[in-house]
Regions:
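Register position in tetratricopeptide repeats
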Residues: 62-63, 96-97, 130-131, 163-164, ...
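Structural marker of alpha-solenoid helical repeat scaffolds
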Residues: 79, 112-114, 146-147, 180, ...
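Terminal, low-structured helical/coil segments at or just beyond the last alpha-helical repeat
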Residues: 35-44, 266, 326-367
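Canonical tetratricopeptide repeat
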Residues: 55, 89-92, 122-126, 156, ...
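N-terminal leader/linker segments that initiate helical-solenoid repeat arrays
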Residues: 15, 30-101, 105, 112, ...
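TPR alpha-solenoid repeat register
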Residues: 52, 86, 120, 153-154, ...
Length: 367
């Protein structure tokens, strides 16, 4: 007969060890389950909190409380920064509150999150334009055009190239912009300015005229056209446009009066030309350049005594002006007082020997 095995716990030395192992496994399993539950709770809490602040922000937005809505969207973003819905509301709120730098960054993030829509690219293009981020304007204009070929981007591309003094590209894209929006007066104006900045005044003029035709109230454009005509020695049209600019409200400051005075003198209207320059002298009585200009205007119109009077004023402020003394001498000779005139010219030549050549030239030219 077999002997019965004794398996009583008290008699088995392995039993306590097995019991300990089982207890450890049970504790670890419970801890692991608790950790997983905690993670799920935290995750769910973050999502719930983000949605709570998002919904609260939407209510504030609907009630017209834009700043309060922004505060809630910012809180929502802290809980869930990868939410497209929250990022979109955040971008819109920043934009509405004119926080354009933050709006631009939010729209960039929205694109990074996968929302590469035409609307978002358009916002990025226009915000980059407002913030003078020229390279980004070109980048997002290209992306926008690829996503939606019907979008009008050429004005922005042309303007950026114009601002960067890249006139060739500016003219190319601005001509395309003119096709997209023929009524935008800024387009021909920038083309005109591009040609003018390259000293190609002949090509600039028709674009200035087109811009003014589209927006006749722009008195500064009219004034600029007058100056372009002046540079081309088109004195009649220079006077016409400078006068028109003044009639349409361009400020009659000293620069304007000087250019208007010169324009009058260039068409032979001594009285009006001098009147403009004298108006400047009321404000700037010791302006030597204007005094000399008036003196020369009188001299070349045969008004020799008036010329002498103004060159005398130059000498009052600058006794070393040999040229003014020389011209006074020439004026006296023209008046018939040759001896007095020659003596003054000789004295001027002593002060500045280079004037001797001028004397010879003027005598030969009968001036």
């Amino acid at each position: 007969m077999r002997k019965a095995l004794n398996i009583h716990p008290n008699n088995n030395p392995m039993y306590p060890k097995l019991l300990i192992v089982c207890l450890v496994l049970m504790i670890n399993s419970a801890n692991a389950q608790t950790s997983i539950t905690a993670i799920n709770v935290v995750g769910n809490t973050s999502v719930d909190s983000a949605d709570y602040f998002l919904q609260k922000g939407l209510v504030e937005k609907q009630n017209g409380r834009r700043l309060e809505s922004l505060k809630n969207f910012e809180k929502a973003a802290k809980y869930d920064g990868s939410s497209k819905a929250i990022t979109a509301e955040l971008a819109s709120a920043y934009f509405d509150l004119r926080r354009y730098n933050q709006a631009r960054e939010s729209y960039k993030k929205l694109v990074e999150l996968g929302d590469a829509s035409a609307a978002n690219y358009k916002q990025l293009m226009t915000l980059s334009y407002q913030l003078k981020q020229n390279d980004d304007v070109l980048l997002y204009a290209d992306k926008l055009k690829r996503v939606d070929p019907t979008e009008k981007v050429y004005f922005y591309v042309g303007k950026v190239n114009y601002d960067m003094d890249n006139y060739g590209e500016a003219i190319k894209f601005l001509n395309e912009a003119a096709k997209e929006n023929p009524e935008n007066a800024e387009v021909p104006y920038m083309i005109a300015h591009s040609y003018a900045d390259m000293m190609n005044y002949k090509l600039a003029i028709p674009y200035f005229q087109k811009a003014i035709q589209l927006d006749p109230a722009k008195n500064y454009w009219i004034y600029e056209l007058g100056l372009i005509c002046y540079a081309m020695h088109d004195d009649k049209n220079a006077l016409k446009y400078i006068l028109e600019a003044g009639e349409k409200g361009y400020k009659r400051d000293n620069d304007y009066l000087e250019n208007l005075g010169i324009a009058y003198l260039n068409v032979g209207d001594l009285e009006q030309g001098v009147a403009m320059l004298v108006e400047i002298l009321k404000r700037k009585p010791s302006d030597l350049n204007i005094l000399k200009m008036v003196a020369e205007a009188y001299y070349y119109k045969g008004k020799y005594q008036q010329a002498i009077d103004y060159w005398d004023q130059v000498l009052t402020y600058d006794k070393t002006s040999a040229t003014s003394l020389f011209m006074i001498g020439m004026a006296y000779q023209k008046k018939g007082e040759k001896e007095k005139g020659i003596a003054l010219c000789d004295k001027a030549i002593e002060m500045d020997p280079t004037l001797a050549a001028n004397k010879q030239k003027k005598m030969m030219a009968g001036l």
